[in-house]
Amino acid sequence: YIRGSIKHKLLHGHNAPNRKKHIDRIVEKLSCTTISTPYQWFLLGTAVHYIADCFTFAHNEFFTGGMAQHMKYEMLLQPIFHNFVNGLKEPQNKYKTYYFNLSFYHKMYQNENRSFLTDCKYIVSSTEKLLDSLELVKDEVPLLSTQINLAK
């Protein structure tokens, strides 16, 4: 049954090529209002999840493994990601960008070395860009991504 009518619905925004329309639709809904209801927070969480998937090696076309390798990659990435985020310190300089271009970020990501660290850097940085573009990050709150160098 999975190979039939629900196959593509399962992937939704979970892979990089498929993410744009799903994330754009969510951002459009959220940018028109203050996020205050449980449903709006759920939508924001969904967008963040899709962005994280976009910058996860196993969710991209260049990943050639099967589902078992996909699951193994994500299991190995999870503790590395937690350690990565926990290791970020509050930056001294404040930084704010109002422009979020996921396609540009993803093109940069595709040209990087494939590694857990690359995934972590792009997931954190792109998620902050999304939150910033929705003005959920206040001016007085320094962004963690100022510590992450995405340039080659």
Where are these regions (language model features)?
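N-terminal leader/auxiliary helical segments
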Residues: Y1-K152
